[in-house]
Structures are given as structure tokens and as C-alpha cells.
Amino acid sequence: MKYCLKIIKKDGNVTNHYFSSYEDLEYNATYCQFSTNIIKAIGLEVGLFKTKTLFEIG
């Protein structure tokens, strides 16, 4: 199982950051709460056949 942090910035750029554990995903997502450049951050659980949204910050 992989985890993805999808970050949507004010300038329209979308970046994906992948992590091997939920703890790493959650740790990095906390920084998004304090950034003024980020519109939304979405935490995803990425499986072989299914992607599940875990949380949204924004």
C-alpha cells in the first residue's frame, strides 16, 4: 500500500508526493496547514485497483 499527498497550489500547479507509511503522509500534511501558497492538500491511499481519499486540508 502506498500513500499520496496531492498538493494544489494557488498558481494552478498540482504535485504528488508518495510515501510508504501513513505516519509519513500525516507528518508532511501538517506543513500544508500553515502554507499560504497551497489551496488544498489531499491525502490518498493508493492501492493496485482502488484509490481512497483519507483527508482534505484546505
Language-model features: locations:
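Short aromatic-glycine-(Arg/Gly/Cys) micro-motifs in beta-strand/loop hairpins
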Residues: 1-14, 42
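Hydrophobic beta-strand residues in large extracellular and virion-surface proteins
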Residues: 5-7, 19, 25, 38-41
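Intrinsic disorder/low-complexity signal
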Residues: 10, 22-25, 44, 55
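A short, exposed loop/beta-hairpin motif centered on an aromatic-Gly-Thr core
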Residues: 12-23, 32
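Short, mixed-charge low-complexity intrinsically disordered segments
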Residues: 32-58
